[in-house]
Amino acid sequence: MRQSTLIHPACIKAHPPHAAPGQTIGLLGGSFNPPHAAHRLISEAALKRLGLDKVWWIVSPGNPLKRRVHTAPLAERMHLCRSIATNPHIVVTDFEADLPTPYTTSTLAFLKARSPLVRFVWIMGADNLASFDRWERWREIFTMVPVVVVDRPGWRLKALASKAARAFAKSRRPETDAATLAQTPPPAWTFLTGPLSHASSTAIRNKAKTNHQQVARKAQPPEELPWRKLKAESPEATAEIPAAPEGS
């Protein structure tokens, strides 16, 4: 298996949060574009069920799999993350922006080399497991750290039937053993069920786009509104159309 190319940590200017030897840190990485309640719910589930000391939200500069999606500036996403990550055990960080590559394997290799006495666990939602085989060197991620997958509405069956889940089926641990997952040598992963949040970054972006379009439509001069143009062209066709409401 191809290994991650690792530059010695001392040569990299990235500064992740402090972690003391012996601590167990959960890593939730992503573009957080934007962050939402489900991110916090996933983190708190992992904190409680795995007995983690902290969860780091690793806010990436961009997602290689979502190049066509508009990504808000990193500083803006960091600000939003801090406003949502109200749990004192959740730490928001953007150190990945200072790493040579944006891939998870490189991030994990850097952290493990920098803090060899800290136990790291990768956290992700079931929606990410469903498409995990699209990630760069995804198999390697499973061999580097234990992985916890937290259920997401409508994604359980797709996640558990995914290529990644099938490839590492023998490494799956019962949910009842979640408390010992961080101490289990990789590859090892478990699937957590529990309270769910329907929030998603995609849905939030789509809603914002729709709202923007509606605002733009209302801002059009009255003579540019489609129904007015239609009436001007054919009065008979719009005889039953009521007058436009005030403020339109």
Predicted feature locations:
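Nucleotidyltransferase catalytic core that binds NTPs
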Residues: 1-248
